Amino acid sequence: MNPLIIKLGGVLLDSEEALERLFTALVNYRESHQRPLVIVHGGGCVVDELMKGLNLPVKKKDGLRVTPADQIGIITGALAGTANKTLLAWAKKHHIASVGLFLGDGDSVNVTQLNEALGHVGLAQPGSPKLINMLLENGFLPVVSSIGVTDDGQLMNVNADQAATALAATLGADLILLSDVSGILDGKGQRIAEMTASKAEQLIDQGIITDGMIVKVNAALDAARALGRPVDIASWRHAEQLPALFNGTPIGTRILA
């Protein structure tokens, strides 16, 4: 069975209750299903907290964090360090054998600089599946941060949705984007069960989908096109529904290519 990538986002890393629910769902799923799982995570809330403590400005452009050269070390420490190891600690607590990685390990995801204006922000492209497939074959849960490295050794901060998309293409995996929201909402705050590219463009033009959600929707659309299969956007808040989601039952918004 092809692997499933679960991309974690939002304030999940700040909530012990959410992490407990998520890892309980992961344990239950792994006990009853053989499907290999991979976690990809960002950690914007961890970065924001650290930047605030250091009195450093947080600047975003089109939903992407501007990352100057003097901040990439701090952001790497927050994402590949604190956020990644927090998730590994929760996996350990729940007796799940896990391995912490970043995108550059085993050249799993290739990264180039997105553009000069954003600084150390990377564009993710599919890489080599060898390392992660080896870990999956041996029963490990890879936990991958959204920090990458260019061919000339420059660390890059990669949007975690886009990192997960590139890794899904690398592994031929299905993809779920878990966030704070239960899916994409229409103008009345109602969840949209299915979303096509034309519907997404319409809602962006109307100002209903904005900021970071535009990046999330575009990443999901890119993933659906690249993978040739639907991608789910859903919430981690409903833990009891997560095993069904991991098994292919939509509970949020299903993005169609």
Swiss-Prot record:
GO terms for molecular function: acetylglutamate kinase activity; ATP binding. GO terms for biological process: arginine biosynthetic process via ornithine; L-arginine biosynthetic process. It is found in: Cytoplasm. Gene3D superfamilies: Acetylglutamate kinase-like. Pathway: Amino-acid biosynthesis; L-arginine biosynthesis; N(2)-acetyl-L-ornithine from L-glutamate: step 2/4. CDD domains: AAK_NAGK-NC. The record marks K7, K216 as: Transition state stabilizer. Homodimer. HAMAP family: ArgB. Catalyzes the ATP-dependent phosphorylation of N-acetyl-L-glutamate. This is Acetylglutamate kinase. It comes from Salmonella paratyphi B (strain ATCC BAA-1250 / SPB7).
